Amino acid sequence: KSFALLYPYSIPLYRRLGWEIISNKMTYVIKDTQVPQKIREPGYVRRVAWDDQDFKLLHGMFAAKTHGCLYRNKLAWEEYFRWDEDDTVVAIYYTAKDVPTGYMVYMISSDILHVKEMIYLDREAQLGLWEYIHKHDSMIDEVRGNNYYSEPIAFELDDSDIKETIRPY
């Protein structure tokens, strides 16, 4: 079965008409000193091309278990990252057994690491990606990113005094 999703220009209006928000978008800002530092995961992170199959397969696995995350067909992939390919990097976390379990799409600009998307299938990948971010600490003053509402960031940090914004999406 198919169903339609739309982003309303007026949430109160659409609620009066019987529609509801199914997901939230969370953004965060973390100072470089707040990025987790004592992480030593057994896997590794590799930068890959935009057409890498592990990248797209990981998103499909994540979408299958995450509320509000849509599967992306070829057109959706092209539209979502259309203007980003030249400026951003795709980095995949692999376990010690070379199994991909997480990725992040990011760019570094004006001493800020911008995370466009970070997904992980397990705790090891989550920590491994944060370890990768920490390895860039000499290049950045802060991390700004987007995250799925079901994946809180502040709870994971030693210093959880960060800025998080939650908006309907």
Language-model segments: residues:
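Short, mixed-charge, low-aromatic patches
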Residues: 11-18, 33-36, 84-92
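Intrinsically disordered, low-complexity, positively biased terminal segments
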Residues: 40-169
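Residue-level detector of alpha-helical recognition elements and their boundaries
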Residues: 21, 28-29, 92, 144
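Conserved active-site alpha-helix within GNAT-family acetyltransferase domains
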Residues: 2, 7-26, 128, 150-167
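Contiguous, non-catalytic segments that form substrate-binding/exosite surfaces or channel walls
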Residues: 28-44
